[in-house]
């Protein structure tokens, strides 16, 4: 799983392969200098002829080698960080783009905070993997092998003693599965924490109104401690290992120094050999000691990337069609349509309904009868399990999603507004609109006068989800947004439920005016709105029981 996930990560790094290649080359140069420098030091110390030109050349070469090593380290680190950061951005962009194509049922089963964590925190772990963990692991392995060879070249018995003292450190690999599982648990707990925080911050008004501050403090506070507990569980194996690694590292150095001193006394080693050997020991234990940290980072990064890839692997059930819906007239046909949400009763039961272009139809019925579901099927937020929905005689599954939705405007009871300006929110449905068109749509939605009364007019910032506006104002803004789009099909789902009677009358007159030549479906409980319709369709238990 680890190798498969790492290989998948690097498919996103392809645009930056040149930078990564240069970074790897620079890293290999650093390794080469690290392996070469102790030999130069040995030659310098073993020079018995005094300070000669050869000694000067060796000393200058050693200084230049260390200078070059510093430059190559800077090049390697800079390029690897640049490539890893942009690789993370590529993954995040891909995951987010995929999330936009997923059906509503996917979001119904998941919480916003969890999904945000997968796109942000989990993917961010990849940066450490690409920039540090993998390069460090590769360089440490190569360095350890190179140092081992060099030590055996210098003195076989001393090299053998060194390897024997380091064997216990290699047991770190036995803990990989436990660590990976622990870090996955930590990321899951972090997602739960973010979800609760997001939900609480959005519902702060209700928390205060119902005096639930203490309850929520306790509930959310528990998630902080849950994350701390799982994080501690993930790192405690390394807390056990670190003292052991340190002990065996020190033990090896003591043994080597003692054995080396004995060999110098017997004449089997020169002073230069011992100095070179001690330098190699530092290089040898360094990579081995760092192995635990790099493995920890790899485990964290792979666990985080796997959670992000789980989203990317979710199937897209709403497939795009190939037919571009140009200049449709608005004939809508439901043919024996059946639909149910996951793990729920049947919402629509073999409904057949024909709506000619230009007709205004009111859909009425009890809550849960299936009225809103009919509208959602038209814009393909869901697809029916049975039957077919057609527009102008063409199955809407054959249309491209973009062209289909460009021909439909919808105003829902649950209005969503972005945190920008009023102008930005209205123009969200049609970015190339003129200001005159924006004014006209706002007037039809009976909100233009209110907007002009504000200090900044259409440039007024409305806050997150339009928090600075009342419910009725938010609804009228959404109506203006739908009117501006000027689509041949208009869907109104309890669009005036939050406005007063006078404002509703103004909006009704506007709907009557703009509905000429358009197909309009109105979901409503208000008799005043029903009276404006050409037809009234009554739905009960997912079936049409009256059509007049």
Task: Place the predicted regions along the sequence by residue.
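Transmembrane helix-loop-helix hairpins at lipid-water interfaces of multipass membrane proteins
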Residues: 2, 20-72, 152-157, 267-271
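A short amphipathic helical element positioned immediately N-terminal to and/or at the very start
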Residues: 2-15, 115
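Conserved catalytic Walker-motif region of ABC-type ATPase nucleotide-binding domains
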Residues: 99, 220, 334-336
């Amino acid at each position: 799983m680890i190798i498969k996930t790492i290989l998948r990560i690097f498919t996103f790094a392809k645009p930056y392969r040149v930078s990564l290649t240069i970074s790897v080359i620079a890293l290999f140069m650093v390794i080469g200098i690290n392996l070469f420098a102790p030999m130069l030091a040995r030659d310098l110390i073993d020079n018995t002829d005094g300070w000669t030109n050869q000694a000067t050349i060796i000393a200058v070469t050693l200084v230049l080698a260390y200078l070059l090593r510093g430059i190559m380290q800077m090049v390697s680190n800079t390029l690897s960080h640049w490539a890893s950061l942009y690789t993370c951005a590529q993954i995040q962009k891909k995951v987010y783009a995929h999330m936009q194509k997923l059906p509503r049922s996917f979001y119904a089963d998941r919480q916003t905070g969890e999904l945000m964590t997968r796109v942000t925190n989990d993917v961010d772990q990849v940066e450490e993997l690409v920039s540090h963990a993998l390069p460090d692991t590769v360089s440490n392995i190569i360095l350890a092998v190179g140092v081992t060879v060099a030590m055996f070249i210098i003195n076989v018995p001393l090299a053998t003693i060194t390897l024997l003292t380091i064997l216990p450190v290699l047991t770190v690999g036995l803990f990989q599965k436990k660590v990976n599982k622990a870090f996955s648990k930590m990321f899951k707990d972090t997602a739960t924490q973010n979800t609760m925080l997001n939900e609480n911050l959005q519902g702060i008004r209700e928390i205060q109104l119902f005096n639930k501050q203490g309850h929520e403090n306790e509930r959310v506070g528990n998630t902080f401690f849950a994350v701390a507990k799982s994080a501690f569980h993930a790192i405690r194996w390394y807390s056990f290992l670190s003292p052991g690694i340190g002990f065996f590292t020190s033990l090896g150095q003591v043994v080597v120094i003692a054995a080396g001193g004995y060999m110098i006394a017997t004449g089997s080693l020169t002073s230069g050999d011992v100095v070179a050997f001690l330098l190699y020991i530092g290089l040898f234990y360094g990579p081995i000691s760092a192995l635990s940290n790099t493995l920890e980072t790899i485990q964290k990064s792979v666990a985080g990337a796997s959670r992000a890839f789980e989203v990317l692997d979710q199937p897209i059930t709403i497939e795009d069609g190939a037919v571009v819906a140009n200049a449709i007239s608005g004939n809508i046909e439901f043919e024996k349509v059946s639909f149910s949400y996951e793990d729920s009763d049947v919402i629509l039961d073999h409904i057949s309904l024909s709506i000619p272009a230009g007709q205004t139809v009111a859909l009425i019925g009890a809550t849960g009868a299936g009225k809103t579901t009919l509208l959602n099927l038209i814009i393909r937020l869901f697809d029916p399990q049975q039957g077919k929905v057609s527009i102008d005689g063409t199955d809407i599954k054959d249309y491209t999603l973009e062209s289909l939705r460009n021909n439909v405007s919808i105003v829902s009871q649950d209005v969503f507004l972005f945190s920008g300006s009023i102008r930005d929110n209205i123009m969200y449905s049609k970015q190339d609109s003129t200001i005159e068109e924006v004014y006209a749509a706002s007037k039809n939605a009976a909100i233009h006068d209110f907007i002009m009364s504000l200090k900044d007019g259409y440039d007024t910032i409305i806050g997150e989800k339009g928090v600075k506006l009342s419910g009725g104002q938010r609804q009228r803004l959404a109506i203006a947004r739908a009117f501006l789009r000027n689509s041949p099909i208009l869907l109104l789902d309890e669009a005036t439920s939050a406005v007063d009677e006078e404002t509703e009358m103004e909006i009704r007159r506007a709907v009557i005016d703009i509905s000429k030549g358009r197909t309009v479906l109105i979901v409503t409980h208000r008799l005043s709105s029903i009276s404006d319709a050409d037809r009234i369709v009554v739905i009960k238990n997912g079936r049409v029981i009256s059509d007049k």
